[in-house]
A protein has these predicted regions:
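Basic, polar low-complexity surface loops/patches
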Residues: 1-100
């Protein structure tokens, strides 16, 4: 998994950016508020909980980067996409609904 501390720092103060990371399995994932924002922007995401070290869980969305709305992309590289998004309330309610 990508550097967890970096992800958590970004998501703690996330005010309208969506961070998507390519992981070792070759798949792309968004976490926490980025996953929430992305779920508001795109339908059909695979959402779930990522359990880390058996104690900490993070909301995670698997992303097909070929379906991203290109007009929202701020930057991208081989391992990361950053998109702009106008945030909405409801993250904590959405988080409570994610199944294990």
């Amino acid at each position: 998994m990508c550097e967890v501390v970096t992800i958590l720092e970004r998501e703690l103060n996330n005010a309208g950016l969506i961070y998507i990371y390519q992981e070792g399995d070759g798949k792309w994932y968004a976490y926490e508020q980025s996953a929430f924002y992305l779920s508001q922007m795109m339908s059909g995401l695979s959402l779930g909980r990522y359990i880390m070290d058996g104690t900490l869980w993070l909301a995670r969305a698997e992303v097909d980067v070929n379906l991203l709305p290109w007009e929202n992309i701020v930057s991208y590289s081989k391992t990361e996409y950053v998109l702009h998004y106008t945030p909405h309330n409801g993250f904590h309610e959405w988080l409570a609904e994610i199944k294990e």
